Amino acid sequence: MTLHTLNSQNTVLNKFIAQIRDKSIQTDSMRFRRNLERIGEITAYEISKELSYTPRVVETPLGEATVETIDDRIVVATILRAGLPYHQGFLNYFDDAENAFVSAYRKSTKDGKFTVKVEYISCGDLEDKVLLLVDPMLATGSSLVLAYNALCEKGGTPKYTHVAAVIASEQGIDYVSKNMPRQATTIWAAAVDEELTSRSYIVPGLSLIHISEPTRRS
């Protein structure tokens, strides 16, 4: 399974990551959401390099031009609700993509542990399509793998899956690598953090409170 860490090269992406991490700047809810959207757009552009293309002849006012256009049928899926601004960034670039949504939540127990429950899925046919499974935070990876399995159960198995996250933990990346199809999955992370707390919060991470969800799921 391939991992692409987008901030391994210095680009304008660094500015958006810095702002969503900054505890003062991220209190501006509109900027926070817009930066998630921008990071989604940048990630979508990078993923587009890995898709299948076929030549298409288009007619211009002065003649004809041959352009390589995306051949894959794309489905953009996210876990509600924190993923919505990030999800929109992908739709801005893949504007003819289908949508899929998973509503999942963390159910805590008295001993401090938790299980992840899926309560709602909206998903069409995934067979022979490319699935972009996007979630701002990839912490333990358990909710994302659970979402993937639920989507496949309802819509069938996609021909390829791109997992995208704004911030990913090393533990989450490892979990996804071991529990999703290795030859048919690529992980894209804008940034990777090393530490994951006992409550499954990524450190230094960021806060998703400004898009109606507490700091982290799993």
Regions inferred by a protein language model and the residue ranges of each:
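PRPP-associated nucleotide enzymes
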Residues: 1-213, 218
